[in-house]
């Protein structure tokens, strides 16, 4: 479901304008770096404000893509990076659809945000992504319930590049202190769990160039 995004690279994030806030963020970055699980802080656009070394290690092998790198905007990465499924297991239902739900909610709250609008335009330019957003997302939410759209507490599959881990479940935990929340930020951590799955190869569907393959989540029209 990922595709090559055609939008422009997001503009640099504004730096908080008080010394106190900047000092807090610098100290919080030290705290974040001390965590062993991949962690990141994002704003309402999913622009990555900061991320720790474990997060960078998880996605270090991603080939360069101008508008959809995990350390720039995590929403764009999940939706648009052609290799996101190499790390994010069960990519469509585990990651893409929940993130589409978050985009939809963000647009309802921040409808005039230029970056969110740009992401929505990039979705509209791709027939598969547009079908997922308009048809697949409501169908999926109806099938699994609103709770499945929440990230906090969700268990997701990672295909960890460390061969000692391989396919590994993680629990996404949102833990945002008040000072970050006041800035419009949220912190998410991927708590790696002990490997409870057989280390079988995890296959993901590949999309042929120029072929509008049918998304599994989009209901098939009846004849």
Labelled PLM ranges:
Residues 19-42, 48-219:
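Hydrophobic protein-protein interaction segments
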Residues 1-22:
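Short amphipathic recognition helices of helix-turn-helix/homeodomain-type DNA-binding modules
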């Amino acid at each position: 479901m990922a595709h090559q995004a055609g939008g422009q690279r997001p503009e640099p994030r504004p730096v908080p304008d008080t010394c106190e806030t900047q000092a807090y963020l610098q100290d919080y970055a030290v705290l974040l770096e001390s965590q062993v699980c991949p962690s990141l802080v994002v704003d309402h656009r999913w622009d990555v404000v900061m991320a720790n070394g474990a997060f960078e290690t998880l996605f270090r092998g991603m080939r360069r893509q101008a508008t959809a790198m995990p350390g720039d905007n995590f929403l764009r990465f999940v939706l648009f990076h052609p290799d996101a499924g190499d790390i994010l297991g069960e990519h469509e239902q585990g990651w893409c659809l929940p993130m589409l739900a978050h985009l939809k909610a963000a647009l309802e709250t921040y409808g005039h945000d230029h970056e969110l609008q740009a992401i929505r335009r990039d979705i509209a330019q791709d027939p598969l992504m547009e079908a997922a957003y308009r048809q697949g997302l409501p169908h999926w939410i109806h099938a699994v319930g609103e709770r499945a759209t929440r990230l906090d507490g969700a268990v997701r599959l990672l295909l960890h590049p460390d061969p000692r881990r391989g396919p590994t479940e993680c629990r996404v935990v949102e833990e945002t202190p008040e000072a970050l929340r006041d800035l419009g930020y949220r912190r998410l951590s991927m708590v790696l769990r002990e490997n409870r799955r057989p280390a079988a190869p995890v296959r993901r569907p590949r999309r042929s160039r120029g072929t509008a393959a049918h998304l599994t989540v989009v209901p098939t029209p009846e004849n």
